[in-house]
Amino acid sequence: MNQDEQKRAAAHAAIQHIPAGCIVGVGTGSTANYFIDALAGIRSRIDGAVASSEATARRLSAHGIEVMDLNNVDELPLYVDGADEITPHLHMIKGGGGALTREKIVAAVAKKFICIADQSKLVDVLGKFPLPVEVIPMARGHVAREIVRLGGQPMLRQGFTTDNGNVILDVHALQILNPIELETELNQITGIVTNGLFARRPADLLLLGDEGGIRTIAI
């Protein structure tokens, strides 16, 4: 299978994990889009979905899936999303699509987080993919200086504004040996909304598409 076929296979595999009558949290990005397309086939079996971005909400609605406000949802059994990088410990870098803050909120609420990905996303050490950091616009310079102090090379994502009205700094040159520690340290910098490390709340299950089919990794 090529990369797109692996993404599609992982997305379809996640459908088997959705309980009937539940509300599903849905991520953002190319792999999540395959999941949304697959979810449309069982929309009569679910009560609705919580979207992690405006783009995801539009795609869900286009498929006739009810999009629900997270504030009106008492329980979220499942969240399904992709990753830009993921380790065997199921720590991730996410946010390549710029939806990291809402993704992190939905993941925090969900009882179970299933990551769907193609085999290229599985890495031993996080950091080859630039780490997205969502920043309040007026704090951009301050945050960039603090990130340099930590050894990173921040670059403003040009022409991009998040759904929350903020900017993204993509941080290069980080070899993230302790993702939990770095996630915590970055979030203590004033002006950072959140960063794209999902280590304090990792995935519970990885459905990984590769040439041979689907590999399942759990913690």
Swiss-Prot record:
Molecular function (Gene Ontology), one example: ribose-5-phosphate isomerase activity
Xref: InterPro entries: NagB/RpiA_transferase-like, Ribose5P_isomerase_typA_subgr, Ribose5P_isomerase_type_A
Role, per record: Catalyzes the reversible conversion of ribose-5-phosphate to ribulose 5-phosphate.
Gene responsible for this protein: rpiA
PANTHER family assigned to the protein according to its UniProt record, in alphabetical order: RIBOSE-5-PHOSPHATE ISOMERASE (PTHR11934:SF0)
UniProt protein name: Ribose-5-phosphate isomerase A
Source organism phylogeny: Bacteria, Pseudomonadati, Pseudomonadota, Betaproteobacteria, Nitrosomonadales
Alphabetical list of SUPFAM superfamilies matching this protein: D-ribose-5-phosphate isomerase (RpiA), lid domain (SSF75445), NagB/RpiA/CoA transferase-like (SSF100950)
Disulphide bonds in the chain: none
GO BP term (any one): pentose-phosphate shunt, non-oxidative branch
Residues holding substrate: 28-31, 81-84, 94-97, 121
UniProt family annotation: Belongs to the ribose 5-phosphate isomerase family.
GO cellular component, one term: cytosol
